[in-house]
Amino acid sequence: MSVVGIVAEYNPFHSGHEFLMNQARLIAGDDPIIAVMSGNYVQRGEMAILDKWSRARSAIEAGADLVFELPFSYAVQAADMFATGGVDLLTRLGAKNLVFGVEDANLNFEYFGDRISKIPRQRQEFADYSQTYSTQYNQMVAREIGHEVSEPNAILGLAYAVANANLGSPLKLSPVNRVGAGHDEILQREAVVQSASAIRNLLLNGAERSELEQWLPKGEIAAFDQEKVLPNWELLFPFLKYRLESASIKELQQIYQMSEGLEYKFKAEIHLAENFADFLRRVKSKRYTYSRLRRLSLYTLLNVTEADVLNSYDHVSTMLLAYSKRGRKYLKQQRKDFEIDIVSKVDRKNAQEGTLGLKVRVDRLFEQIVGADQNFGRRPLEVN
């Protein structure tokens, strides 16, 4: 069985994701496509613009057969941990092939991933404070493999390859050339595919839904029509300000990835910042990327500590969000062989455990923002 896996955020699901899904179907044939998707919080350190259930439905309607939630402690992370979580989950769920979009599918990701995975860990520790960790890491990679990888999706593809190599290469890697606008580019109205960032900006700036019809599926547009509020950092900024002003330095030092005196910088600059964008500019330095600072801001807002994240890894589970008829058949046949607990219903007992417990806790804020329960009382969506 040639089960194909995809690691994604679908923030939101758009025509570029649909193209990749179609390419995955060419590989899978009649076998299932499994998507491991970030929940209500995404890698760049933000709330997803649409809840996980709506995004999972769009994925199934576009051709996926099963959508599982990537736990928060992997989803809101730098590329290496994000990729590790996604590849590990897909492997445990029986996937044999990983399909992902990149700027140049001709790169030998399996070879590069194997090379990088063998670099001693001590050579991946950097002390040049004039550059970000990611910049220094990319420079090291270029030296080791003799090829500079700088495009965002290629960097993530390389992270998948390294994670796969570290796990013993259980997945065949199938990179696919991206189409349309690049990552984080401004809106290009003539383009068949827009970047997710451009679409989010359009939505947050009050675009008419009719403007989005060429880039978003009808079901996704209908979901946006039903939303009273679209989560974003400017909406959350007052809560972050309260959190930083009310917490002690000692409390802030317990926050996951709070290091090198950033707790003092955060606490000092929050008083002066007019909004979240201004706050990020004030705390930015050559040492940290904006993505790292957004993630740290999110950990702070949600009071996610180092202990919370480490403890969550003691019991890793995944929540089934949506499935097709083909997906249901695959689950029935293979579930007993999966090397991971699949959660179909959150109850008072399992809501205290591992990655699920952390996810349920952080989702509480998302629920307050959007006004809808995200875990208790929810069951996987069957989409035909």
Curated annotation (Swiss-Prot):
Pfam families: HIGH_NTase1. GO terms for cellular component: cytoplasm. It is found in: Cytoplasm. Its main location: cytoplasm. SUPFAM superfamilies: Nucleotidylyl transferase (SSF52374). The gene is tmcAL. HAMAP family: TmcAL. Catalyzes the formation of N(4)-acetylcytidine (ac(4)C) at the wobble position of elongator tRNA(Met), using acetate and ATP as substrates. First activates an acetate ion to form acetyladenylate (Ac-AMP) and then transfers the acetyl group to tRNA to form ac(4)C34. It is an enzyme of class 6 (ligase). Its EC number is 6.3.4.-. One of its GO terms (biological process) is tRNA modification. Belongs to the TmcAL family. This is tRNA(Met) cytidine acetate ligase. Keywords: ATP-binding, Cytoplasm, Ligase, Nucleotide-binding, RNA-binding, tRNA processing, tRNA-binding. ATP binds at residues 7-20, 101, 153, 178. The keyword Glycosyltransferase does not apply. It comes from the Bacteria. It catalyses: cytidine(34) in elongator tRNA(Met) + acetate + ATP = N(4)-acetylcytidine(34) in elongator tRNA(Met) + AMP + diphosphate. It comes from Lactobacillus delbrueckii subsp. bulgaricus (strain ATCC 11842 / DSM 20081 / BCRC 10696 / JCM 1002 / NBRC 13953 / NCIMB 11778 / NCTC 12712 / WDCM 00102 / Lb 14).
